[in-house]
Amino acid sequence: MNTNTLIEIPERYKQFRAGISKFATSKDNKRIENNDQAIIIYFDETDNIEPLLFDKDIVVINDEMNGTPFNQFVAEINFIESNSFEIKKLSKYVAINNSSYSIEDINSINIIGKVIKLIRSFD
């Protein structure tokens, strides 16, 4: 896969640490597939993440009890109403179910990062 393409990180995210991560997920998921990579910005524990997230963002959640050998997994965040949001898993391997939360709980979900650019594998 050619990942040498220059990708511009939006100005609002330049204060955060960024990295490239690979995904391993189910083949039946149309949004993220095996061997896809993503540029992820990582949040600090002290960051208020609510203003950094938009409807239908893909986030990285740290949860050791997610049912996979890894502490982290990706999920879609969807703001359903002005006072609540939903976390939807993007892999059938993750044991955690889709859940809805109050907006006040957004900083306690353990969202540690956000996918800002998906790099599709055409292998």
Q: What does each model-identified segment do?
A:
Residues N4-D123:
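Acidic/glycine-rich C-terminal interaction modules and beta/coil loop segments
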